[in-house]
Amino acid sequence: MQVKNPILGLCQKATFALSAAKVEQCPDDQGYEVAFAGRSNAGKSSALNTLTHASLARTSKTPGRTQLLNFFSLDDERRLVDLPGYGYAKVPIPLKQHWQKHLEAYLGSRECLRGVILMMDVRHPMTDFDKMMLDWAKASGMPMHILLTKADKLTHGAGKNTLLKVQSEIRKGWGDGVTIQLFSAPKRLGVEDAYRVLAGWMELEDKPVA
């Protein structure tokens, strides 16, 4: 008997809901939301598009182009949220400050936020932004799952070594509440593991399929 993860079907039907420049423009604060965060060029949009089997999140050759909170509906009560990318040098400082202000407002106010998926480039993990997000997750008690993206850029052995190293650093500095995995959008590596995390946070149980 096979087991079907219901989050898969929902992600494949994901649709764009709205973009918000500030928290007041977000959907009603109810249901389930999972936010996707990451430093600019960490592969956040590619990961979202891979998980939804669509081109919902904008990808760009110029990192840092995501300037809004972008909401994607899975069903009437479940949403994925693409948060602004951070850290790109060519983005003006006032715009960076604007992004940070509204990111902090979103993270600090949304009662329906069930967890954060944090993207780190496996070749350059644990940036200052990543550590800031880990600090926030620890202080707030928010579940966090890390995707070490672009794993296809490293050999299997090098990717595994980086995974173990980052796991150890996070465990020492932030405890055992953060989970982590390797991920590659082009190779679809780690997609099923990411689906299981989403399903757990959104309270969707695996269902047997005859």
Swiss-Prot record:
GO terms for molecular function: GTP binding; metal ion binding. The keyword DNA-binding does not apply. The keyword Ribosomal protein does not apply. Keywords: Cell cycle, Cell division, GTP-binding, Magnesium, Metal-binding, Nucleotide-binding, Septation. It comes from the Bacteria. GO terms for biological process: division septum assembly. Mg(2+) binds at S45, T66. CDD domains: YihA_EngB. It holds the Pfam family MMR_HSR1. Residues 30-204 form the EngB-type G domain. GTP binds at residues 38-45, 64-68, 82-85, 149-152, 182-185. Its cofactor is Mg(2+). GO terms for cellular component: cytosol. Belongs to the TRAFAC class TrmE-Era-EngA-EngB-Septin-like GTPase superfamily. EngB GTPase family. HAMAP family: GTPase_EngB. Necessary for normal cell division and for the maintenance of normal septation. This is Probable GTP-binding protein EngB. It comes from Pseudomonas putida (strain GB-1).
